[in-house]
Amino acid sequence: MSQIEHHPQDDTLFSYAAGSLPAALALVVGCHLQVCSTCRSQVRSGESLGGELMTALAPKTLSDRARANVLQRLDMQQSQSDCEQVSVGSETIVSPAAPVKGVMPSLLQKILKEQDFDALPWKKTIAPGLKQIVIDCDEGQARLLRITAGQKMPVHSHRGSELTLILSGGYSDTLGQFNAGDVADLDGSTEHQPLADDDMDCICLAGMDAPLLFKGWLAKLIQPFVGM
């Protein structure tokens, strides 16, 4: 099992607990929670605090967006319940959904109707060494990316927020090395160029609330065809 080194920012986790993250970003956090007990604990703390605040407020009718967020969270929590660590005596049993290279989180399996990354209908893009699967989301963009081993992504920054969860393989950039289970929580202040590890393809789940900002004329030229 990989040791998780990179987690979502605290404000991202509390926004998730409050149900205020756009759907694409919430999907990434939900999949990360399935393999990270540290972040699950933080989200539970945020939910407890939110519950206490709600009881102190006068009841109000939920907006359509708030209701949709609540229903989505309930669905995610149901999937996460299968991923809890269960202590038995002095031993700790970790579910198979732990961050092992090549293992797809059960929440993503439910959406994609598949368990094997290699069996997915990957679509080639005009960008060299990059395949993707677009995931329908009501808010933001979510997609599964497959970067060929040893291949670089174009240099880019962000017009908004981006969350990327490594599912298999890994990549490195100016922020460090990212492996299975790690999350890159990025905003407009970050410019980077992920480089996939040499030993295997890097598969990751990316969610964003605004398109990326590519650097260089060639990257800008192909951006409309990639869709990010």
Please give the residue ranges for each predicted region.
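Glycine- and acidic-residue-biased ligand/ion/polar-headgroup-sensing regions
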Residues: 148-151, 158-173
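Ligand-binding loop in jelly-roll beta-barrel domains
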Residues: 190-214
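Short cysteine clusters
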Residues: 36-39
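Conserved short histidine dyad/triad with adjacent acidic residue
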Residues: 125, 131, 136-158, 187-191
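Sequence/structural segment immediately N-terminal to covalent heme-attachment motifs in c-type
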Residues: 29-33
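Short acidic-glycine-tyrosine-enriched beta hairpin
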Residues: 173-193
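Positively biased amphipathic helices and basic secretion/translocation or surface-docking motifs
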Residues: 1-11, 23-24, 48-117
